[in-house]
Amino acid sequence: MLYHDSHDAQYRDPLGPVAAGNRLTLRFACDESPEVLLRTWDGAERLYPMVSVGESLYEATVTVPDKPMLFWYDFIIRRADGDVRYGNSRDQLGGEGACYDGQPDSYQVTVYDPA
């Protein structure tokens, strides 16, 4: 099982837009590999190893950029037979995602100015 739902607080906290400089916790369910990476993009790509926080559940907490912008994320699942990518649903409306052979459509987080 590979699963993330950007509309469910169990997998994305907080839901909705995030104030600049605040933290965002993302979780991913995976029973196919012990190695899951969170990939983010805010003008530069970053990879974060996700930590097991329960049976088949992985978590990473990141600080979003300190200025308003669109912040993007998806997941890389390392398997013996090759990497699997997991990203936004093909309709790009968020919620439950999809597996991709190559670069996935990323999930979007709106980072806003809290002032």
Segments and roles (model prediction):
Residues 29-35:
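Short proline/glycine-enriched turn/loop motifs at strand-loop junctions of beta-rich domains
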Residues 1-21, 44-115:
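The feature marks proteins involved in alpha-glucan
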Residues 36-42:
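Conserved aromatic beta-strand anchor motif in extracellular beta-sandwich/beta-rich domains
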Residues 22-26:
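Structural beta-strand segments of beta-rich domains
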